[in-house]
Amino acid sequence: MSIPFGLDLGNNSSVLAVARNRGIDIIVNEVSNRSTPSLVGFGQKNRFLGESGKNKQTSNIKNTVDNLKRIVGLDYDHPDFEQESKYFSSKLVKLDDGKVGAQVRFAGKQQTFSATQLAAMYINKVKTTAVQETKGNITDVAIAVPAWYTEEQRYSIGDAAKIAGLNPVRIVNDVTAAAVSYGVFKTDLPEGEEKPRVVAFVDIGHSTYTCTIAAFKKGELKVLATAYDKHFGGRDFDRAITEHFADEFKTKYKIDIRENPKAYSRILAAAEKLKKVLSANTAAPFSVESVMNDVDVSSQLSREELEELVSPLLSRVTEPITKALAQANLTPEEVDYVEIVGGTTRIPSLKNAISEAFGKQLSTTLNQDEAIAKGAAFICAIHSPTLRVRPFKFEDIHPYSVSYSWDKQEEDEDHLEVFPAGSSYPSTKLITLQRTGDFSMQAKYTNKEELPEGTSAEIAKWDITGVQVSEGETSVPVKLKLRCDPSGLHIIEDAYTVEDIKVQELVPLPADAPEDAEPEYREVTKTVKKDTLTIIAHTFALEEKALNALIEKENELSAQDKLVAETEDRKNALEEYIYTLRGKLDEEYSDFASDDEKTRLKEMLAKAEDWLYDEGYDSIKAKYIAKYEELASLGNIIRGRYLAKEEEKRQALRSKQEASKMAELAEKLAAQRKAESEKKESKADAEGDVELD
């Protein structure tokens, strides 16, 4: 049975949660952090994923790729690419399919990876973290992504999960996942005919800002509106601080960090810390040692100065809120509560602006960093066939209208708007077309002008085959089950022909009919399913052959990472054994080895040490094991003698302690018997006494 796994795929860091023990738990990583850096680094032999990649980011800056969720499914020629590219220190390139990829130096040569591959590497890493922490089987996952993700980006994330060995049961909007977390754990929601509670969720993370308004009743929620600014987040504040100090240090210290990626990265990391400090303090010092050219830099920044630096950003705070309210047809007064989510909402100026926009105090019922992951884990649990969870129904909404079109044959129309903007999903619509033979269908966004700049209106295409028209007929009715699935993906779930047949139907007898009345029948026409048709889908999903090739590649890279880690462990074990054994040989092991054994073992240790720091510095796992076992063949004999003597001492001490206890017990028993004897004698003397006059 798979443990339900929820992943809040963040731009700067990601949070993992699982459903277990009748609750939702956050997974800590290998260094006990409750979030894991969202990046992938490449080295001479292996990859550095998550925490290890973050630790090496500054020294390995050109071969470390972060901001992964921003380039998944993104065209190199998309208008967003120019804006995104400034956040990357690694080299981004245009792939053969027109998508964005990253070029890095890995295993001694230049290699290029697609954004989907990079996301898969990271997802595989966090899956491994979850498996190690839970010690269970994890195959199903619900992944939280931005509400503005297109159909193509959702397919790309789903493919990345599959490459990582997971089954993506749902790609869910991140703020919707937070709303689910709110609805599941709130115990005071209205019921029955009571008015729903309207809650606005404002999520400002590392790179994006979303406002979602939802209506709640006990056991259910309905998303009323979602609006966003996909280029507004904590990284913009970090960059504003960094650019400010870049100008200052150019004048003050005559250095230009913009010309040195490592220096810029160090100032950027320090700027992120300063931003957090200024959320709790009105001013703070800023210093970084040896930034570049052996120059130490220092300065300070006040909260007021920061707000002035980011004033263009602050002027955009209310726009998503205004749009969401208009979309939901609500006034700020009609919103009952405003919940804030995401680390960037801790910035005081943002909190004040959000509060003023709604005209009410902000609520912090949810854990700002973990609510999305917990909601995603619960959603994954809903899909589990073996896990029972409390009933909870939720619906998201289509941000844009979607129409289906088909080859024009018998009908006057050749298209239909099936899922209007603002309608709920998941949902299914059944349509009937008169067809003369096999045909094609397409799904497109109805109004291209409503889409974000650069977004393609194309969604998917399907070929429907197997249509057979009966002799004497010119066409046949075809029913199509059109569906927007729980992940917001548009599919044709079923397609089949129908025909009308004549059947005899029993006529109900009148209430006063005699018991022996003969049954009456009438002939009626019924429409029944005739032939199931073949649906060949052409979507943004990877084709099976390409997907399998990427799965195989990821498995190879994972095996190599594992081998490198195990090799390093064996090398460290050998080094530790050399130092430990050498020290003990002159101390606690001294009396348990002959002079000849000491001399021989010290020579072996010296040779092993010389080898380890020379030709063995970069050797293979098997050689480290062989060297270790060679030393252990004699070292363990000496150690065995020492342990045997120690055990002998312990046994002697234990025997002595037991003898002491037995003697003490015997002494107590003797004293007890003596006391009882004296008591009896005293009683006998008392009974024998006779009083004489």
Swiss-Prot record:
Disulfide bonds listed in the record: none
Keywords, in A-Z order: ATP-binding, Chaperone, Cytoplasm, Nucleotide-binding, Stress response
GO MF term (any one): ATP-dependent protein folding chaperone
Signal peptide region: none
GO cellular component: cytosol; nucleus
InterPro entries: ATPase_NBD (IPR043129), HSP70_C_sf (IPR029048), HSP70_peptide-bd_sf (IPR029047), Hsp_70_fam (IPR013126)
UniProt feature, compositional bias: Basic and acidic residues: 673-686
Intracellular or extracellular location(s): Cytoplasm
Keyword Nucleotide-binding among record annotations: yes
PANTHER family referenced in this protein's UniProt entry, alphabetically: HSC70CB, ISOFORM G, HSC70CB, ISOFORM G-RELATED
Protein name as annotated: Heat shock protein homolog SSE1
Native source species: Lachancea kluyveri (strain ATCC 58438 / CBS 3082 / BCRC 21498 / NBRC 1685 / JCM 7257 / NCYC 543 / NRRL Y-12651) (Yeast)
